[in-house]
């Protein structure tokens, strides 16, 4: 077991393209290829899958498609194939984040599809389940379905600022005409800004005011034991990530002093993370703690 983990860790550190990870990955846990990524690495480019059962656990890592192809998967009776992918942020795809074709099937859990053309595309007789995922700022649609045959099961997800629409379908005989399809209210879909920490710099951790926190599938749980969040990076409900980092930008600086001042003067204390000296009060002593962090 330790040997397998070491190999997975070594592969993640020694390769920066998703294609390299794919080529160097082997079977594990019932999958033909088992890919586990390192959250501290930004992986480049997509992959093509045409046979086998593939598992990708990004552990919160970013896959930057660099305006190229995304992850595509195709299957038929002779070469069946499936993709299970979780905890991934897939960004900057010229055509799509993930595309399913033929008779392939997939499961997408806690993934972000951002700044692609289509977040997810489905063709032919594909069958895909999506939960706890975010579709935002995609140039065309969050999800695009070609023909009436694909089966989409989606719940507990968020759509936000997709330029042409969120979920659209193009059926035979329509040419290039698309029609929007509405998701049922009972699917727990959110249409709002997910409030990432730093969208432009690929920090897709959730701000503590994010509507995604504890809004995921109630049958799934985050590492802190709370109800699952929506998105690739779960929010830790039990801890302040960095003591003194009140705005959660991963830095302790004058902006945190401003936040603490607003907390004291206007009672804008958004969490117990503001009580830095743990005296159950918000006052100038907490400001002094932040200043000490900055100076030392």
What is the role of each PLM region?
Residues 3-13:
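Sec-dependent N-terminal signal peptides
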Residues 8, 32-34, 45-64, 82-84, ...:
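Beta-solenoid repeat scaffold
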Residues 17-53, 64, 171-176:
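N-terminal extracellular ligand-recognition/capping segment immediately after the signal peptide
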Residues 40-41, 61-62, 159-165, 200-202, ...:
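Acidic glycine-/aspartate-rich tracts in secreted/extracellular proteins
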Residues 42-55, 63-86, 92-103, 122:
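Extracellular beta-strand-rich solenoid/capping regions of secreted or surface-exposed proteins
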Residues 87-89, 97-101, 105-203:
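Predominantly extracellular beta-rich ligand-binding scaffolds that present long acidic/polar faces
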Residues 138, 224-230, 237-296:
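Cellulosome-associated attachment modules in secreted, modular CAZymes
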Residues 187-233:
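C-terminal accessory segments
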């Amino acid at each position: 077991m330790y040997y397998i983990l070491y190999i997975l860790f070594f592969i993640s550190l020694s390769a920066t393209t998703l294609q390299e990870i794919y080529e160097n990955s082997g079977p594990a846990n019932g999958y033909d290829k088992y890919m586990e990524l390192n959250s501290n690495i930004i992986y480049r480019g997509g992959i093509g899958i045409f046979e086998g059962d593939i598992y990708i656990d990004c552990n919160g890592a970013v896959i930057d498609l660099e305006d190229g192809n995304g992850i595509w998967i195709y299957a038929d009776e002779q070469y069946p194939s499936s993709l299970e992918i979780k905890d991934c942020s897939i960004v900057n795809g010229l055509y799509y984040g993930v595309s399913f074709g033929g008779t392939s099937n997939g499961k997408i859990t806690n993934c972000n599809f951002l700044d692609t053309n289509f977040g997810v595309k489905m063709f032919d007789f594909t069958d895909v389940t999506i939960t706890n995922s975010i579709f935002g700022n995609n140039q065309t649609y969050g999800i695009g379905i070609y023909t009436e045959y694909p089966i989409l099961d989606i719940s507990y997800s968020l759509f936000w600022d997709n330029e042409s629409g969120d979920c659209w379908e193009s059926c035979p005989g329509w040419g290039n005409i698309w029609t929007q399809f509405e998701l049922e209210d009972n699917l727990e879909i959110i249409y709002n800004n997910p409030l990432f920490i730093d969208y432009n710099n690929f920090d897709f951790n959730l701000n503590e005011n994010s509507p995604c926190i504890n809004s995921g599938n109630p049958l799934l749980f985050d590492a802190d034991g709370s109800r699952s969040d929506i998105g690739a990076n779960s929010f830790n409900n039990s801890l302040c990530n960095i003591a003194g980092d009140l705005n959660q930008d991963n830095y302790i600086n004058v902006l945190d002093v401003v936040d603490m001042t607003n907390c004291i003067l206007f009672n804008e204390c958004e969490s117990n993370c503001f009580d830095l000296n743990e005296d159950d009060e918000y006052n100038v002593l907490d400001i002094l703690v932040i200043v000490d962090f900055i100076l030392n």
